[in-house]
Amino acid sequence: MKNNLNQLIDIFENQIPANKMIGMKVDQISVGKVKVHVPYQEMFIGDYRQGFWHGGILASIADAAGGLAGFTTLTSPEDKINTIDMRIDYLAPAVKSDIFVEVNLIKVGKRILNADVVLYQKDIHNPVAVARCAYSALRN
């Protein structure tokens, strides 16, 4: 799918129901690198007393964005990516504001891809969460 990044954006934003429901938008995409943002919605609140984002929503965003970065390395429409492992560290509360995500693939092997994912709100140097994701690549 390296050759058609615009098609990947459409699939990611419009054809994956969970991504569409969350409202994920691709800001930048290149092979192995992705920037995504998610506009804040009231339904994302997990701690209603303090108004913080639900950690599960943040994990879903990290996983989806990391998978998109993995898809940028594939060459055939029949190739597939599956999450095999993910670790997320929550570093600060995510408040009632948009979430921004930057993903960098750190290793692209024949069968395994590894991604570093940073989720932040105002400043990438002050992240709300970081994740390390591993994906299996099923290449045809």
Regions found by a protein language model. Name each.
Residues 3, 94-96, 100-102, 106-140:
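HotDog/MaoC-like acyl-thioester-processing domains
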Residues 56-57, 64, 85-90, 117-119, ...:
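Hydrophobic alpha-helical segments of small multi-pass membrane proteins
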Residues 22, 32-34, 82-86, 97, ...:
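A generic structural signal for short beta-strands and their flanking turns/coil linkers
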Residues 55-76:
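Active-site helix/loop of acyl-thioester processing domains in fatty-acid/polyketide metabolism
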Residues 40, 74, 135-137:
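Short beta-strand segments enriched in hydrophobic/aromatic residues
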Residues 23-52:
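Catalytic strand-loop segment that frames the active site of acyl-thioester-processing enzymes
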Residues 1-18:
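Extreme N-terminal tail/first-helix region
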Residues 69-100, 105:
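Hydrophobic beta-strand-centered segment that forms part of the acyl-chain substrate-binding groove
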